[in-house]
Amino acid sequence: MGNQQQHPIGIFDSGLGGITVLRALYRQLPQESIIYFADTARLPYGDRSPEELIQYVREILTWMEAQGVKMVVMACNTSSAIALDVIRSEFKTPVLGLILPGARGAVSQGKRIGVIATQATVNSGAYENAILEANPEAAVWQMPCPEFVPLIEANRINDPHTKRIVQKRLQPLLEQGIDTLVYGCTHYRHLSGVIQSILPSHVICVDPAEYVVSATEQELELMGWKNPQSPLPTRFAVSGCPDQFAQSAKGWLGHQPLVEQVDLKNLIMNASPLSITNG
């Protein structure tokens, strides 16, 4: 692969959620080149079986490696919870997930911890296990929020119906007296305004995106892979409709990106490097 320092970091999610990780990377590692992939054709991930998720991530990692990435960040809690260990055993490229950094961030803030996440992430028990491993004295309550991702992807963040759904999902956690709330899905940061309007002021929100980017920086330093030069423009690719993703991403990026469509089913035959797009 040549000089690893100048190779891009790969980020992937099922959709818009990973943009929260992308923006954290822009802030903390502005010199790094990035490839962002959204598996929008198979969104949402939260109701997929473990077998399906592992296969999806295999396909994405195969494509990412063909693009020459030096590292991959799973900007998706569901795939981090279900597929991370399997994928790490199958691919040479270093892969970072959200669960462990997010759990460590949570226990640094409080002891009565609520986790909002997809059904698959909740079912996996990954956050609860990681939080209790980091602090056995912590108390953890999890709440699946299956409605959140479709509402965010449909750009219904400011819809009164959305606030009612968020209130319904948060209420059981508030009744437990949580002092910390973990965004256990990268999409949920997009609802932070709604969520924080409902939470008492003393409840601290933890965004694992910030912590996984810090872990990414530490890994790059350890490997000697930090990019000493200016970054290339961010490259965006999706498995679904490029125009739809570009329009939806515009509000979060501040500009409308150029987006390439990738057919993951044919990726082994056609995994040629992406042309650089504006970002």
Swiss-Prot record:
It catalyses: L-glutamate = D-glutamate. It comes from the Bacteria. InterPro entries: Asp/Glu/hydantoin_racemase (IPR015942), Asp/Glu_race (IPR001920), Asp/Glu_racemase_AS_1 (IPR018187), Asp/Glu_racemase_AS_2 (IPR033134), Glu_race (IPR004391). Pfam families: Asp_Glu_race (PF01177). Keywords: Cell shape, Cell wall biogenesis/degradation, Isomerase, Peptidoglycan synthesis. Substrate binds at D13, S14, Y45, G46, N77, T78, T186, H187. One of its GO terms (molecular function) is glutamate racemase activity. It is an enzyme of class 5 (isomerase). Pathway: Cell wall biogenesis; peptidoglycan biosynthesis. The keyword Isomerase applies. The active site is at C76, C185. Its EC number is 5.1.1.3. The keyword Isomerase applies. GO terms for biological process: cell wall organization; peptidoglycan biosynthetic process; regulation of cell shape. Provides the (R)-glutamate required for cell wall biosynthesis. Belongs to the aspartate/glutamate racemases family. This is Glutamate racemase.
